[in-house]
Amino acid sequence: MQRYFIYLAYDGTNYHGWQIQPNGSSVQECLMKALSTFLRRDVEVIGAGRTDAGVHASLMVAHFDHEDVLDTVTVADKLNRLLPPDISVYRVRQVKPDAHARFDATARTYKYYVTTAKYPFNRQYRYRVYGSLDYERMNEAARTLFEYIDFTSFSKLHTDVKTNICHISHAEWTKMEGEDTTWVFTIRADRFLRNMVRAIVGTLLEVGRGKLTVEGFRKVIEQQDRCKAGTSAPGNALFLVNVEYPEDIFSEETKKSVLSTLLPEGGEC
């Protein structure tokens, strides 16, 4: 059995998230239908993570299996013909048979976009905030995330996860180049909990508005209680932008780094 990674992007506006839902469309379902149509059999697709409803991805990774060796360029081309306009496949890449899109991922990176400007053409991809925010104070609070590994306070309640332990390696607010009214929160970790990034952003916004001190943000983490954290920021401004893997999971002929050939310069949307 051969295993393949699919590198794709999607606009999550019209989807109830990545994962198949009983009463709503999902990115996973669309991808499975396209693959099943092309390969003429039922195909299961496993993603690197589960983005929530309305959340986007400029780079998601998923895997599927097939008995025969496939021409990966042809697979990518056929999928792009079958998929709706808001889902695009960058590349299909053969990996080792035991490689896993979710469990072998070593890091994931998300970006969240906040703007003070009213602009109709990016309203689906920015969270508009009112009034000024203290981004220096927000970054000071964000740096405290590196001191902790239990993020129960930022996890969705009543989920089936076995642990709320995550290792955050980057968390920073920066002004978006070319857009003086837009700031971007970039966060990288080995794994993320359900709703975690949006909960962190929502709580950091309270710091930026002066409603919560940096020490108060620290206490929110330490209390390990979701009710103590801020309201989750809307999903429409959140993007999954990268998923990282060890090189040894790739077959010998595909060991070149994929990102340099997939993403636009800067790797942002």
UniProtKB/Swiss-Prot annotation:
Keywords: Isomerase, tRNA processing. One of its GO terms (biological process) is tRNA pseudouridine synthesis. The active site is at D52 (nucleophile). Gene3D superfamilies: Pseudouridine synthase I, catalytic domain, C-terminal subdomain, Pseudouridine synthase I, catalytic domain, N-terminal subdomain. GO terms for molecular function: pseudouridine synthase activity; RNA binding; tRNA pseudouridine(38-40) synthase activity. Its EC number is 5.4.99.12. Pfam families: PseudoU_synth_1. It catalyses: uridine(38/39/40) in tRNA = pseudouridine(38/39/40) in tRNA. It comes from the Bacteria. Substrate binds at Y110. InterPro entries: PsdUridine_synth_cat_dom_sf, PsdUridine_synth_TruA, PsdUridine_synth_TruA_a/b_dom, PsdUridine_synth_TruA_C, TruA/RsuA/RluB/E/F_N. Belongs to the tRNA pseudouridine synthase TruA family. Formation of pseudouridine at positions 38, 39 and 40 in the anticodon stem and loop of transfer RNAs. Homodimer. This is tRNA pseudouridine synthase A.
